[in-house]
């Protein structure tokens, strides 16, 4: 089940403040996704879209229970701040995960952060995005507030996850998009908590990988590498420039 809201950018600070306060009642089955998008009614205007999704796919879960989990958001000031809203929509998990089969060139750099206001810092730069490009920018608010299982191998270095894959068409647009995206991440990176190893870090920022380890563990990995790969024949996945 899902509730969604559209907001003008001038109320975005208030929206983030409300969501921060609602973290106290956030259930681990509830996903909060706050994104910057082009207004469906006016592509020249940027708006904020909030989706609150309850994944109720366990035995015994019901629509009534899902509505109960969504109730704190419906009863907050989110509704009065929004320009439009759709409440308690029943959706299928397959539809939620569907992605159109499209081919794009891309760049991607995600961060963990404890400050949801990171989204505010990039609003003006977002408006300067190259034409015909698509930034799937989304803040997973309170991603790391669920039950933490100490026996699980799971890495999360902050309260919120900010994902920002950039998509575009044509190799002739590579330079413009990569330059714009580099500036975007220079704005975002000061908000990062520790470091999230991204899919392109080995190519673009190999030294960042070291930031993901304590100095002690980094030296252990270096020792193992020197033992089994003394001639450095393998890819420098450990972040050596």
Give the ranges of each region predicted by the language model.
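Soluble FAD-dependent oxygen oxidases
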Residues: 1-241
């Amino acid at each position: 089940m899902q509730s969604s809201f559209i907001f003008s950018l001038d109320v975005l600070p208030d929206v983030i403040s409300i969501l921060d306060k609602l973290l106290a009642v956030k259930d681990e089955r509830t996903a909060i996704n706050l994104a910057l998008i082009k207004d469906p009614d006016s592509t020249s205007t940027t708006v904020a879209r909030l989706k609150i999704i309850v994944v109720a796919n366990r035995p015994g879960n019901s629509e009534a229970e899902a509505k109960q989990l969504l109730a704190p958001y419906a009863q907050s000031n989110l509704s009065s701040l929004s320009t439009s809203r759709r409440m308690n929509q029943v959706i299928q998990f397959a539809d939620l995960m569907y992605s159109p089969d499209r081919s794009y060139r891309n760049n991607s750099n995600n961060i963990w952060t404890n400050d949801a206001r990171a989204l505010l810092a990039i609003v003006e730069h977002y408006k300067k995005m190259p034409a015909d490009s698509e930034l799937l920018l989304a803040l997973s608010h309170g991603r790391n507030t669920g039950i933490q299982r100490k026996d699980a191998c799971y890495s999360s270095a902050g309260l919120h996850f900010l994902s920002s894959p950039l998509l575009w068409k044509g190799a002739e647009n590579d330079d413009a998009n990569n330059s714009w995206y580099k500036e975007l991440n220079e704005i975002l990176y000061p908000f990062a908590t520790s470091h999230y190893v991204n899919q392109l870090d080995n190519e673009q920022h190999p030294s960042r990988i070291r930031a993901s380890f304590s100095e002690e563990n980094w030296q252990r990995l270096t020792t193992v590498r020197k033992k089994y790969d003394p001639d450095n024949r393998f890819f420098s996945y450990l972040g050596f420039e």
